């Protein structure tokens, strides 16, 4: 980490979300876009802490204009909050030392009462551990090592608790292109995301019209369990294409062509609706569409399990939802301390809808419990 990034992380711990404000020394007030706040005497030598507290108020009070008189805590409480954020910041943990904290106190908290305990979020009850840890890895030299380390800790509550101080919420964001810099996996993921989105669009239009007119009295085959493993992903895709071509080569060929190109959301919806009109009312085509949709979901979930290094022990929990360029998938882990997992796969583009990356956002929640041993 260079000096500029280190300073940015420390500033983030002082004020988690930037708020424009000015300290008027002539009037001893802090002016903001949402109000003016008189600074009490015990904060006049701790301007950084005064800014941090006002920033905390602005972030936690939704009132457009704050007119009430603030209940300013002891400055040491604000200082404790900043230290707590720094200690638990994922990018700063390696820099924390006695000398670092001593220098921090000499800079922004010299002379504070060391007997004051707690933070702004929990006064008088000891240092509060933040309930969220956020990671973002987008550069090739770091992604694979960092992401692999995170997933190796994920299933072991003792490791997570000791490494991340009993946090219960994690958001890991990383570049798939950097994670899978070589090999077929990255390309396969981009392609199956596109195929899944197109089939979701078409199915949405078909189901909407089916609900209106109760079309398709013939029972369709039940949807396959998308979480089962596929031994050979490429074989599944190839056999799928051959099977559908036998039913209606022209129609499925058009869908395949649409899957091969990225374009605007409006263009996708227009073409998907036109194709859906040719499927509605034809029970065989509707059945084949459902098979295709299920197969692409299976391929997607198979690749996703490889991506999060969880083959065979993770199940799709509440299905998935989609937008024009992203898919959200809910997962269920067998470990009891992992209570909820959502994975967001978002395609990133250059000009002319050229896909260049898939940004992965892995969100999980834990159930806090005692550490073994």
Swiss-Prot record:
Its main location: nucleus. Changing residue 317 to I: Abolishes interaction with STB, but not with REP2. Pfam families: Rep_4 (PF05797). InterPro entries: Rep_fungi. GO terms for cellular component: nucleus. Changing residue 93 to Y: Abolishes interaction with REP2, but not with STB. Changing residue 297 to Q: Abolishes interaction with STB, but not with REP2. It is found in: Nucleus. The keyword Cell wall biogenesis/degradation does not apply. Changing residue 246 to A: In strain: ATCC 44827 and ATCC 7754. Changing residue 204 to R: In strain: ATCC 44827 and ATCC 7754. One of its GO terms (molecular function) is identical protein binding. Changing residue 154 to S: Abolishes interaction with STB, but not with REP2. Interacts with REP2. This is Partitioning protein REP1. The gene is REP1.
């Amino acid at each position: 980490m260079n000096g500029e990034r280190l300073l940015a992380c420390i500033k983030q711990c002082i004020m988690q979300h930037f708020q424009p404000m000015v300290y008027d020394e002539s009037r001893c007030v802090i002016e903001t876009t949402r109000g003016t706040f008189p600074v009490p005497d015990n904060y006049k030598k701790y301007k950084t802490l005064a800014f941090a507290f006002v920033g905390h108020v602005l972030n936690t009070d939704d009132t457009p204009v704050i007119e009430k008189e603030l209940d300013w805590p002891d400055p040491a409480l604000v200082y404790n909050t900043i230290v707590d954020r720094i200690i638990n910041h994922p990018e700063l943990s390696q820099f924390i030392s006695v000398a670092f904290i001593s220098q921090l106190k000499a800079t922004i908290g010299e002379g504070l009462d060391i007997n004051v305990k707690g933070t702004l979020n929990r006064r008088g009850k000891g240092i509060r551990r933040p309930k969220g840890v956020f990671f973002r890895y987008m550069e090739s030299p770091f992604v694979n090592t960092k992401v692999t380390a995170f997933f190796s800790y994920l299933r072991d509550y003792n490791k997570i608790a000791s490494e991340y101080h009993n946090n219960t919420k994690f958001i890991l964001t990383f570049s798939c292109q950097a994670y899978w810099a070589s090999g077929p996996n990255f390309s396969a993921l981009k392609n199956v995301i596109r195929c899944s989105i197109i089939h979701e669009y078409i199915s949405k239009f078909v189901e909407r019209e089916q609900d209106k007119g109760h079309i398709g009295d013939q029972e369709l085959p039940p949807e396959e369990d998308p979480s089962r493993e596929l031994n050979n992903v490429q074989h599944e895709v190839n056999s799928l294409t051959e099977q559908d071509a036998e039913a209606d080569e022209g129609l499925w060929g058009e869908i395949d062509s649409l899957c091969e190109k990225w374009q605007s959301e409006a263009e996708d919806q227009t073409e998907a609706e036109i194709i859906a009109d040719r499927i509605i009312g034809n029970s065989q085509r509707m059945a084949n569409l459902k098979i295709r949709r299920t197969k692409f979901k299976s391929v997607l979930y198979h690749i996703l399990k490889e991506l999060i290094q969880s083959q065979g022990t993770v199940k799709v929990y509440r299905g998935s939802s989609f937008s024009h360029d992203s898919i959200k998938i809910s997962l269920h882990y067998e470990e009891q301390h992992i209570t909820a997992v959502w994975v967001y796969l978002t395609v990133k583009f250059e000009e002319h809808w050229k896909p260049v990356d898939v940004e992965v956002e892995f969100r999980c929640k834990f159930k806090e419990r005692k550490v073994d041993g």
